[in-house]
Curated annotation (Swiss-Prot):
Biological classification of the source: Eukaryota, Viridiplantae, Streptophyta, Embryophyta, Tracheophyta
Protein name: CASP-like protein 2B1
Organism the protein comes from: Eutrema halophilum
Cellular localisation: Cell membrane
Keyword terms of this UniProt record: Cell membrane, Membrane, Transmembrane, Transmembrane helix
Main location: membrane
């Protein structure tokens, strides 16, 4: 209670804590979306610009990312993830500037579904590229597949860097999808509390 005889009600304190928590969650989401956008873009550029030319028995062979379909898929997925994150960065910034909170269930479902889809795509892209990279690095003696990375060392190293960067972007998307799940399902939890207070 203050000296003026006016106290703080528990509802006001809880509301202030919720606003502070909501601000922190939105800031975390914005930072994660910026990180995912940058990491996905770097991963796509690292892999898409990677080439190496080797001469094998007087024949020049150029290794490029389009030679492995898993790398093409990874570049496309990272491009999509970067564009998607950029769009949602704008949404986050506008929401923070307006001070608005997401109360629309259909919009929350759309954001949650989009985040889930992009998270699954990035995880699938990293998994496929990692499997192809393992074959390139280790070969497959039973199928008489040779170790490509012994020939194209620079190419394999840059692809490895791209896959590692894509893995970080993928982890970021999984975290973002967790935040969007929190934002969605808290809309359902608050209604029960409000309905219970009416009785």
């Amino acid at each position: 209670m203050s000296y003026l005889g006016v106290g703080l009600s528990p509802v006001n304190v809880a509301g202030t804590k919720m606003k502070l928590m909501d601000r922190k969650v939105r800031l975390t989401e914005l930072i994660l979306r910026c990180s995912v956008c940058a990491l996905a873009l770097v991963a796509a550029i690292l892999i898409a610009t990677d080439t190496q030319v080797k001469e094998i028995f007087t024949i020049q062979k150029k290794a490029k990312y389009t030679d492995m379909k898993a790398l093409v898929f990874l570049v496309v997925v990272n491009g999509i993830a970067a564009a998607y994150s950029l769009l949602h960065m704008v949404r986050c910034v506008v929401g923070m500037m307006k001070g608005s909170v997401l109360f629309s269930k259909p919009l929350a479902w759309a954001i949650f579904s989009g985040d889930q889809a992009i998270a699954y795509l990035t995880v699938a892209g990293v998994a496929a590229a990692a499997q192809s990279a393992a074959f390139a690095k280790l070969g497959e003696p039973e199928l008489q597949w040779m170790k490509i990375c012994t020939i194209y060392g620079k190419f394999c190293n840059q692809v490895g860097e791209g896959i590692a960067t894509a893995l970080l972007a993928s982890i970021g998307m999984v975290l973002i999808s967790s935040i969007s799940a929190f934002a969605l399902f808290r809309l359902y939890g608050g209604n029960k509390a409000q309905q219970g207070s009416r009785w």
